[in-house]
């Protein structure tokens, strides 16, 4: 007795993913991109001295908030000391693009490109969900 298995071409097998799972992942990714865009914009404005650091206290964890505050203080100190205006380096920043990647269902890593009048910067962000709230646990501004 011979058993024959039907042969399928390589392009016909498509993995079936439940629509509810796909929708949740897509919705999380949209939310992560929106949070990243707003957080990066605010962080660049903090460095420029046009936004107070406390506005990011709910979004950033303590370590990120302290590091950003320290960097902003260094920039302010250096611009006060320098004869040329360093504050002009951060004028009119705009977040041009945001990309996000799921590490686990509760952890995402994202990158953003920020352009201002004189330079383009890359920003990397790690977001972790705790008690249904996304918080930035790592923020690297290039």
Which residues does each predicted region cover?
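Hydrophobic ligand-binding cavity/cleft-lining segments
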Residues: 38, 47-51, 61, 65
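Hydrophobic/aromatic beta-strand elements that line small-molecule binding cavities or substrate pockets
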Residues: 97-100, 111, 123-127
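Short beta-strand segments that buttress and anchor functional surface loops
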Residues: 109-115
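Juxtamembrane and targeting peptides
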Residues: 1-47, 76-77, 81-95, 100-103, ...
């Amino acid at each position: 007795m011979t058993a024959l298995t039907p042969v399928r071409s390589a392009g016909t097998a498509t993995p079936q993913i439940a629509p509810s799972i796909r929708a949740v992942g897509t919705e999380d990714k949209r939310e992560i991109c929106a949070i990243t865009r707003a957080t990066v914009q605010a962080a660049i404005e903090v460095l420029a001295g046009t936004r107070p650091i406390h506005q990011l206290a709910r979004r950033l964890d303590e370590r990120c908030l302290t590091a950003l505050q320290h960097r902003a203080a260094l920039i302010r100190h250096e611009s006060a000391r320098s004869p040329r205006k360093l504050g002009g380096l951060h004028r009119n920043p705009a977040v041009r693009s945001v990309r996000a990647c799921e590490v686990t269902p509760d952890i995402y890593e994202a990158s953003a490109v920020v352009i201002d009048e004189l330079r383009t910067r890359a920003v990397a962000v790690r977001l972790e969900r705790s008690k249904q709230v996304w918080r930035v646990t790592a923020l690297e501004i290039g």
